[in-house]
């Protein structure tokens, strides 16, 4: 009797594509873990690149990332995303290894989705402000310390753009994570 019951149960669990619900959840959790790790890597690299962006223009003048508010915004938001992604990686590893959520399902599903959405918008906003400032500096419409062009500051503008580009990479993977957590919300809500 037990073997018959388990055969019926396993045939009900298998979807017509041949994957069980548990296998699909495990694969989904693995993909989310990869996206979280990529978000963390890109945001951490962006923080490092922007945080080390200091150059000497001449004997008396130096330019640094903290001289420009948009670049401060880029660094601060990428640091926040880095910390958030680290926590989410820990939660994703826990979920992947234990096959269960760390927090109650209702809370964790909405926590992940809401924070992914909010932080993705924040990250996009910061990078957009940063790229606008970098473009103004590069075009010469705004001068460094009111007197110097980007060409006078070595690789300062290029390094700022690289950091912002890495921030957009973090945004891409955070947006993909948000898409998957949104699907998780829909699956939870309609099941």
Curated annotation (Swiss-Prot):
The chain's Cytoplasmic topological domains, given as residue ranges, are 1-29, 94-116, 184-191
Question: Which controlled-vocabulary keywords does the entry list?
Answer: Cell membrane, Membrane, Transmembrane, Transmembrane helix
Q: What is its main location?
A: membrane
Q: Which GO terms describe its cellular component?
A: plasma membrane
Where in the chain are disulfide-linked cysteines found?
A: none
The membrane topology term of the UniProt record is:
Multi-pass membrane protein
Highest taxon in the source lineage: Eukaryota
Q: Where in the cell is it found?
A: Cell membrane
Where are the Extracellular topological domains?
51-72, 138-162
Q: Where is the chain membrane-spanning?
A: 30-50, 73-93, 117-137, 163-183
Q: Which Pfam families match?
A: CASP_dom (PF04535)
Q: Which InterPro entries does this one have?
A: CASP/CASPL, CASP_dom
Q: Quaternary structure?
A: Homodimer and heterodimers.
Q: Which family does it belong to?
A: Belongs to the Casparian strip membrane proteins (CASP) family.
Instruction: Give the protein name, as stated in the record.
Output: CASP-like protein 4C3
Q: What is the lineage of its organism?
A: Eukaryota, Viridiplantae, Streptophyta, Embryophyta, Bryophyta
């Amino acid at each position: 009797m037990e073997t018959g019951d388990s055969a019926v149960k396993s045939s009900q669990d298998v979807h017509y594509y041949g994957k069980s619900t548990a296998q699909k959840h495990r694969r989904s959790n693995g993909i989310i873990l990869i996206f979280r790790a990529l978000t963390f890597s890109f945001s951490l690299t962006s923080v490092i690149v922007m945080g080390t962006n200091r150059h000497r223009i001449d004997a008396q003048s130096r330019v640094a990332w903290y001289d420009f508010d948009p670049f401060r915004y880029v660094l601060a938001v990428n640091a926040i995303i880095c910390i958030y992604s680290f926590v989410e990686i820990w939660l994703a590893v826990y979920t992947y290894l234990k096959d269960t959520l760390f927090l109650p399902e209702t809370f964790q599903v909405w926590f992940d989705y809401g924070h992914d959405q909010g932080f993705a918008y924040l990250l996009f906003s910061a990078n957009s402000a940063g790229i606008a400032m970098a473009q103004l500096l590069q075009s010469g419409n705004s001068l460094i310390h009111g007197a110097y062009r980007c060409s006078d500051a070595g690789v300062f503008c290029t390094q700022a753009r690289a950091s912002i580009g890495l921030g957009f990479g973090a945004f891409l993977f955070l947006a993909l994570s948000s898409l998957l957590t949104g699907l998780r919300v829909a699956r939870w809500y309609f099941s």
